[in-house]
A protein has these predicted regions:
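Catalytic machinery of carbohydrate-active enzymes
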Residues: 1-346
C-alpha cells in the first residue's frame, strides 16, 4: 500500500475543483491511502468520500500561520511515512511542506500554475487570448506524473448516496414547477453582476409562476440584501445564513438550474451535477477555472478586447465603467436561464 499526501490549502472554489479528481484517483487505487491537507472549514466539502481518503486540517490563521508553523506541521506529517506528495497548490506554504519531505527523500509533484500564460491572458490590449489548460486537467496531470493513472469516474457527491428528502422538504417545501438557484455574489467586485441589474433579473424570473427562486449567499451584508429581495417578491426564498454547507449542497442538487457568478457556488453545483448558467466579467473561462463537467456554452460574457483583465477579479477596471458586466442585459440572462430550463423565451 502506498500513501499519498495531497495539498490544497485554499480557496474554497479551488478546493472544490480538486474533489472530482481526488475521488476518481482514490477509487482507481483502492489499495492506496490518500490524505488531503486543507483548511479545517473546507474539510466539510469532502462528503461521501472514498474510504481510502482521509482529511487533515491546517490552520493557516492560527498555529500554521507562520512559515515555522508550517515547517513544524510538515515535520509531524513525515512520521506518517508518505510515499509521495502531490502539491495541488504550489504556493509558499505548500512548497515549504514539500521541501521538508524532499529532504527526507520523498518525491514531490507540483501543479503547473501557468503564471506566465495567465499574465499574457490578462494583459492590456492589444492581445490575442487563447484558452489555458483547465485547472482540473492540470490537477489530473500532477497525479499522472506521480504514477497514479485513473479515469474520471466522479459524477456527483450524491451519485451513490441519496439525499435526505426530509431535509429538502424542510428547507424548501414541496417542489412545484422549476427550482432555480441564484448566487449573485462573489469574493471580488470584478466578478459581481451589478446589484440593480441582478434585482431586475430576480424581478423577471419571479414573475413567472412556474419558477421558484432560491437565493444563496453569505451572512452579514449579503444576507441582508437577499432577505430584502426575497421579502418583496413572490416565490423567492433567501437561504443565506440559515443552513450548513452540506444542507445547501443537498438543496443545490435538487435545483433545475443554478445562476451564478464566477464563484465557489458555481463549483458547488458542479459537485452535485446541477446545470449552471454563469455570468463572467473581469475574469474569463479561458483562464481554466470553469467548473468540472459543465458546458462553457452556458457562460454569459461580453466580447471586449480588455477581457480578461484579471485571473481572480481582484483588479480595478482599466476603463472605469465595468462594461464587461454592465453591458450584459438582465433580459439576456433571463432568456438563457429559461432556454436552459426548456421553457418559452420571455
Amino acid at each position: 500500500m502506498a500513501k499519498t499526501l495531497i495539498i490544497r490549502l485554499s480557496a474554497i472554489g479551488d478546493v472544490a475543483m480538486t474533489i472530482p479528481i481526488i475521488y476518481s484517483v482514490a477509487r482507481a487505487h483502492p489499495e492506496d491511502a490518500f490524505t488531503v491537507l486543507t483548511q479545517p472549514f473546507l474539510t466539510t466539502l469532502f462528503i461521501h468520500r472514498p474510504e481510502n481518503v482521509t482529511l487533515v486540517g491546517v490552520d493557516t490563521k492560527g498555529t500554521e500561520h507562520s512559515l515555522w508553523g508550517v515547517v513544524r506541521l510538515a515535520l509531524r506529517l513525515t512520521h506518517e511515512r508518505f510515499d509521495r506528495v502531490v502539491d495541488l497548490h504550489n504556493v509558499i506554504r505548500s512548497r515549504a511542506i514539500g521541501f521538508v519531505f524532499q529532504l527526507r527523500g520523498v518525491p514531490v509533484y507540483r501543479l503547473d500554475k501557468m503564471r506566465r500564460e495567465r499574465r499574457a491572458l490578462t494583459a492590456r490590449p492589444p492581445k490575442t487570448i487563447r484558452p489555458l489548460r483547465p485547472v482540473t486537467e492540470r490537477y489530473a496531470d500532477v497525479f499522472r506524473a506521480a504514477g497514479l493513472s485513473f479515469s474520471r469516474t466522479f459524477v456527483s457527491l450524491f451519485a451513490a448516496h441519496l439525499v435526505d428528502e426530509a431535509v429538502i422538504s424542510e428547507m424548501a417545501g414541496e417542489k412545484t414547477g422549476h427550482w432555480v438557484g441564484v448566487a449573485p455574489f462573489a469574493r471580488h467586485v470584478g466578478k459581481i453582476y451589478p446589484p440593480a441589474q441582478m434585482e431586475r433579473v430576480i424581478d423577471l424570473l419571479s414573475g413567472r409562476e412556474d419558477i421558484t427562486l432560491f437565493l444563496f449567499g453569505g451572512k452579514g451584508d449579503e444576507q441582508a440584501v437577499l432577505d430584502r429581495w426575497a421579502a418583496a417578491r413572490p416565490r423567492v426564498r433567501s437561504m443565506a445564513g440559515r443552513y450548513t454547507l452540506n444542507q445547501e449542497l443537498a438543496l443545490i442538487s435538487r435545483l433545475d438550474i443554478f445562476l451564478c457568478m464566477d464563484s465557489a457556488n458555481m463549483h458547488f453545483a458542479a459537485l452535485v451535477g446541477t446545470p449552471v448558467v454563469s455570468v463572467w466579467g473581469a475574469t474569463h473561462p479561458f483562464a481554466g477555472f470553469y467548473p468540472y463537467g459543465l458546458s462553457p456554452e452556458d457562460a454569459i460574457q461580453e466580447d471586449l478586447d480588455c477581457r480578461p483583465c484579471s485571473t481572480f477579479g481582484d483588479k480595478p477596471c482599466h476603463r472605469g465603467d465595468w462594461a464587461c458586466m454592465t453591458r450584459i442585459a438582465p433580459e439576456r440572462i433571463v432568456r438563457r436561464v429559461v432556454e436552459r430550463l426548456g421553457g418559452v423565451k420571455p
